[in-house]
C-alpha cells in the first residue's frame, strides 16, 4: 500500500495472543509479562483451559492495559488442551460457542469490559478452516450472538471464499498471520510434525512479523513467494524467549513508518 507520494504506507498490524490458558493450580503462559505488548487478548473460556477465576483475572489484566478482549472458545477437551477434533453436529457447535462466549462476556460485563471479537481455538479453529460447512456454522453462531463481533481466522493465499461467506452471513472477518510459523504455498501452516514448522530464532520471528506488516511476501516451504493479507498477527507468550520475541516485535512494528 502506498500514499499519494508513492511512499509505502504501513497499516497497523494488531498483535493478538492466547491468554488465560491456566486452569486451577496448573499454570500456562506468562500473561502478565506479555499483556503490555499486545493489542488483543484471546481469552480461554473454560473448555480447553481457563476457569472462572482465571477468566476474571485475565479480563482484569487486559482492561488494566487497554487490551481488546476476544473470546477463545474450543471443543470441550481439557485433557487434550482443545487440540483434538470432535465429531460435533452444527447444533452442538453453536451451543458450545454461545456457552463459552456468553460466559466470558458476562465476566467482562461485571468488570466494565466487553467481548469484542471471537477466535476459535486449536482443533475447532483448524476444522473451521478446513471445512466450509463448519466455517458457516461458526459464522452463523457468532451472528446469532452478536453480528457486530468479528471472527478471527487464518489468512491464506486466497481469502476470497471466506470473505464471501462472512459477507453473506453478515459477520466481519479479521484475518490473522503467524510470525513464528512456516507456511505452505497455499498459505496454510506447515504441520508441526515437519522440521522447520516453528521458527525458534527470535530474529527470524521479528523479520517475518515486519515483512507481514509491510505487506511483503514470505518464502513458502516449496520456495515460492507467498502473499498474505492480514489485519492481525498471532504471537505467543509461553516462555521467557517468546516473551522477549513479542517485545522485539512490538518495538519493530512501532518503529515502522505509518
UniProtKB/Swiss-Prot annotation:
Reactions accelerated catalytically: 5-oxo-L-proline + ATP + 2 H2O = L-glutamate + ADP + phosphate + H(+)
Gene Ontology terms describing biological process: carbohydrate metabolic process
EC number per UniProt: 3.5.2.9
Gene3D superfamilies recorded: Glycoside hydrolase/deacetylase
InterPro entries named among the record's database cross-references: Glyco_hydro/deAcase_b/a-brl, LamB/YcsF/PxpA-like
Domain of life of the native organism: Bacteria
GO molecular function, one term: 5-oxoprolinase (ATP-hydrolyzing) activity
Alphabetical UniProt keywords: ATP-binding, Hydrolase, Nucleotide-binding
HAMAP family the record matches: PxpA (MF_00691)
Function: Catalyzes the cleavage of 5-oxoproline to form L-glutamate coupled to the hydrolysis of ATP to ADP and inorganic phosphate.
Subunit structure: Forms a complex composed of PxpA, PxpB and PxpC.
Family: Belongs to the LamB/PxpA family.
Record's protein name: 5-oxoprolinase subunit A 2
Organism of origin: Pseudomonas putida (strain ATCC 47054 / DSM 6125 / CFBP 8728 / NCIMB 11950 / KT2440)
Amino acid at each position: 500500500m502506498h500514499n499519494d507520494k508513492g511512499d509505502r504506507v504501513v497499516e497497523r498490524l494488531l498483535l493478538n495472543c492466547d491468554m488465560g490458558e491456566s486452569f486451577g493450580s496448573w499454570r500456562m503462559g506468562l500473561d502478565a509479562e506479555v499483556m503490555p505488548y499486545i493489542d488483543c487478548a484471546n481469552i480461554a473460556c473454560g473448555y480447553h483451559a481457563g476457569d472462572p477465576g482465571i477468566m476474571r483475572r485475565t479480563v482484569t489484566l487486559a482492561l488494566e492495559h487497554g487490551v481488546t478482549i476476544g473470546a477463545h472458545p474450543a471443543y470441550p477437551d481439557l485433557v487434550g488442551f482443545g487440540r483434538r477434533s470432535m465429531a460435533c453436529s452444527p447444533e452442538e457447535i453453536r451451543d458450545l460457542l454461545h456457552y463459552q462466549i456468553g460466559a466470558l462476556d458476562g465476566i467482562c460485563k461485571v468488570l466494565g469490559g466487553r467481548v469484542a471479537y471471537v477466535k476459535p481455538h486449536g482443533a475447532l479453529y483448524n476444522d473451521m478452516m478446513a471445512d466450509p460447512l463448519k466455517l458457516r456454522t461458526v459464522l452463523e453462531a457468532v451472528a446469532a450472538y452478536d453480528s457486530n463481533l468479528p471472527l478471527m481466522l487464518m489468512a491464506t493465499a486466497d481469502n476470497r471464499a471466506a470473505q464471501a461467506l462472512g459477507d453473506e452471513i453478515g459477520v466481519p472477518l479479521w484475518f490473522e498471520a503467524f510470525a513464528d510459523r512456516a507456511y505452505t504455498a497455499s498459505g496454510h501452516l506447515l504441520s508441526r510434525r515437519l522440521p522447520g514448522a516453528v521458527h525458534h530464532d527470535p530474529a527470524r520471528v521479528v523479520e517475518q512479523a515486519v515483512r507481514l506488516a509491510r505487506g511483503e511476501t514470505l518464502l513458502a516451504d516449496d520456495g515460492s513467494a507467498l502473499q498474505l493479507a492480514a489485519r492481525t498477527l498471532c504471537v505467543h507468550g509461553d516462555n521467557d524467549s517468546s516473551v522477549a520475541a513479542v517485545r522485539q516485535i512490538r518495538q519493530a512494528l512501532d518503529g515502522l513508518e505509518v
